Amino acid sequence: MPPGRSTYRFPRFVCLSVAACANVALAQGPATSPPPDERLKADILVVAAHPDDESLIAGYLARAVLDEHKRVCVVFTTRGDAGQNLVGYEQARSIAEIREMEARQALGSIGITTVWFLRAPDTPYPDVPDVLRSLGSWNHGNVLGEVVRFIRLTRPDVVITMLPDIVVGENHEDHQASGVIATEAFDLAGDPTWFPEQVAPPEDRLWYSNLMEGLHTWQPEKLYYFTDASHLDFVKDKGPEYSMKDISPSRHVSYARIAAQETSFHKTQYDGEPATSLAGGDLSSYEQNLIFILGKSLVGGSTTGDIFQGVVSDPIPFRPSRGYQQSNTLNHGRNAEFSIELGGGWAFYRSFWPSHNLDSLPRLLEPEIGVGSGQNFPVPLVLHNNTNNAVTFTLRTQVPPGWSLDSNSAQYAHHLLPEKAFLVAANDYFPLRIRLVAPRFSKSQWQEIIWSADADGRPAGSTTLRVYVTGN
């Protein structure tokens, strides 16, 4: 090579490469936009709180996957790090690892392999469940964004989640919170203004470090709830009912047996109980009909019809819920001059249900809780003053024989007597937490507690709570 001539030829190579790419592009025709990842497409998305909550509906999920060939994905909002361990010493972070493994094995046994675990904290058991505790400790908006993302990723026709209501049963507040968030996500996943970074196109999908996710908005068609209530009279005819005694055509055993087998993988939570039932042939606890509660359907169909009744194959348009409207709030007189109502989760649900078009839920059952014999527990109350003047409320508590009031239980008060005065400012409210002590019963039974109030001598209404006291 002659002296002084450069040996650097990279620019020419680049020019040739660019020209070659241009020729290839012309040969291939116009660029196309890739469709959503079909590997994630689901017919059903289940949103539950803890690894093992899915076992409540394992019989139906087996039916859907094994015999109806539906695609099911599952999201757990927690990893169950506050749960018990009936087979070992592992707890906290370690029990979460084990419970995740158990859930994957359990769901895998019925053909469900697409499972995600969020990292919301598993809320320890309180005296009385309050969904607001879970929503607060979870960082509500963060978990909501995650569930919206999974709806947009999986594009389900149907969302199945836990009942957002307070019922007698296990009724963990995390269970309720998963239902609240799944309901909100059902209503928001089709709205591009919510979590817009999820639906914005990436700057360069063929390169690294994109911050926008490139998802599509998605409107699910139907929303169903399941419950861990200990009494199921209130769910009859509120949704489809499936027999767990039916025989699976693919497995040649009952769905009850399949459900027991699925549950048996959750050894830390159930020890050997499902295995014992399977070995002894006593499947009675798994053979009860499984009844879902229809939250809402955007495609019609009857309340008790099959979960997929009315579902269409093509995407449906976004259907916003009505949102919060004070005139539609189930406030039991809050728009009156004075009122008294149950607070906490009960007050929240009175606004939540109508805001999300859950028009059947207020009629499910009257306010209730379950407590143990002799248990000391709190009940939240709220006094409302909707006038332009401060008023003094007088509160009265009516309890059956054997009940007692904790004399230091009223928040913002020195002592709570059967009758107590509370000054409530103009256009304000006064929250109370009253602790009651249940009697000791030999047999379980329902009891009724009634609170009534006067405001400057005028009736301000009353509110009632049904309490199921478990006998010794």
Q: What would you call each of these model-derived segments?
A:
Residues 439-471:
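Terminal connector regions
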Residues 11-24:
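Bacterial N-terminal signal peptides
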Residues 373-380, 430-431, 443-449:
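Short, solvent-exposed loop/turn segments enriched in Ser/Thr/Gly
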Residues 382-387:
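Asparagine-centered strand-capping/turn motif at beta-strand->loop junctions
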Residues 388-404, 408-411:
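Short acidic, flexible loop segments centered on an aromatic residue
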Residues 28-154, 176, 183-187:
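Active-site rim/loop-helix segments in enzyme catalytic domains that contact anionic ligands
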Residues 8, 28-47, 130-136, 140-361:
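Metal-dependent de-N-acetylase/amidase catalytic core
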Residues 403-440:
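Intrinsically disordered, low-complexity Pro/Gly/Ser/Thr-rich segments with frequent PxxP/GP/PP motifs
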